[in-house]
Amino acid sequence: MQQINFYRQRVAINVLAKDIANAKAIYEAAEGHAVIGVLSAQFATVEEGVPEVKRWMAEVPSISVGLGAGDPAQYYKAAMIAAHTHPAHVNQTFTGSGFAAGALAATGGEQTHINALVSPTGTPGEVVISTGVSSSQGMPARVSCEAAVRMMQGMGAHAAKFFPMGGEKSLPELYALATTAARHGMTLIEPTGGISLDNFGIILQTCLEAGVPRVMPHVYSSIIDPQTGNTRPEDIIQLMEIVKALV
């Protein structure tokens, strides 16, 4: 069964891989504490995505079905691919998370972790929840972190994904969201956007200090070799050293 293997029950890292060989190398470098993203955006249809995700799942114990740069148009594909494959994790827009939870429940995939994407507003304590296909085109819906977390829980999401963070730019907002999540029994937060080896530590520490039980930062382009397209296993080792120093 697919699952997220959190280091000391606290931290896992969500990363991309060029191919299955790269994914296996990363997973090994992370000592099993990595979740490997497979993006729905690369598939024209759900039917095309399902066998490919199954192929990755057969080789890597922790797969995350992704959208692709938070693209709301991918919400349906991501949810349905996850419902047909039951990966460890699936990424969702805020508005799509309830749909994904229903699709997974209907197919016996309740163990798949679902996140719901909310975005920074510039004001700690408030987030944008209008991250869906239609809602992202209109007037931004700004709500309190408490309202957002309670709504996520009501829709069946397990985690708040905070994107695009812009690295350290949104740290006070991340802290506010993480403390709210912890206070209301949400067990996982996923900071995403502009995270690198340089700022990974402070971002992780911010979440841990907020008291949220589990943290899964998404670290993407900063650890991908531009020449080969591979995520660098040596960078994963460095990230894990930071995790071990903080947890």
What residues fall within each predicted segment?
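Glycine-rich beta-strand-to-loop/alpha-helix junction loops that act as flexible
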Residues: 67-69, 190-195, 220-221
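Conserved anion-binding
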Residues: 68-168, 182-185
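Charged helix-capping and loop-helix junction motifs
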Residues: 141-146, 172-178, 232-236
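Conserved, mostly hydrophobic/aromatic
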Residues: 203
